[in-house]
Structure formats: C-alpha cells, structure tokens
C-alpha cells in the first residue's frame, strides 16, 4: 500500500508536504505512511481515496483497477 500512495502522489507531481497539509498532519507523519513505518488509519485511507479519486481497495492492493466504484443504486 505504501508504494501505491507514493506513486499516486508522484503522478500528481505533489510533494509530501502538500499531501500532509491536505490531511492536516505533519510531513514527517505522512512520510511514515509512505515508507510503511506506520500503519495508515482508516480515516486517512478514506481521505487519500477521496484525494486521489480512487477506491480504498486500490490503495490496499485488493484490486489493480484505480477507478472508484460506482455507487449502488437505491
């Protein structure tokens, strides 16, 4: 997962500080997610999925399709 969040960030040409500011955290704290030093909390996973317009399953490596899921019709 840490490689996916790094690759997504780099694809946008963003630095760690920019993503950390979006997440309202320090660059050092965010860096630990990308290196795998710290686990990524669910709340941060949700925020990253929203930021990168992808699914949590993609971030977790459960699918190779980066497209977000379609909402289930009610």
Where are the regions that the model predicts?
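Residues that mark the N-terminal boundary/hinge immediately upstream of a DNA-recognition element
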Residues: 4, 15, 41-44, 55
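Alpha-helical residues within the helix-turn-helix
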Residues: 10, 21, 50
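A short, Lys/Arg-rich alpha-helix, primarily the initiator
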Residues: 1-11
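Short, charged recognition helix plus adjacent turn
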Residues: 11, 32, 60-74
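DNA major-groove recognition helix of helix-turn-helix/homeodomain DNA-binding modules
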Residues: 24, 43-58
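Short alpha-helical DNA-recognition segment
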Residues: 13-32
């Amino acid at each position: 997962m840490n490689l996916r969040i790094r690759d997504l960030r780099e694809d946008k040409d963003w630095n760690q500080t920019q993503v950390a500011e979006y997440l309202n955290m320090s660059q050092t704290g965010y860096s630990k997610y990308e290196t795998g030093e710290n686990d990524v909390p669910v709340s941060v996973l949700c925020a990253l999925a929203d930021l990168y317009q992808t699914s949590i399953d993609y971030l977790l490596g459960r699918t190779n399709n980066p497209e977000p899921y379609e909402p289930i019709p009610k």
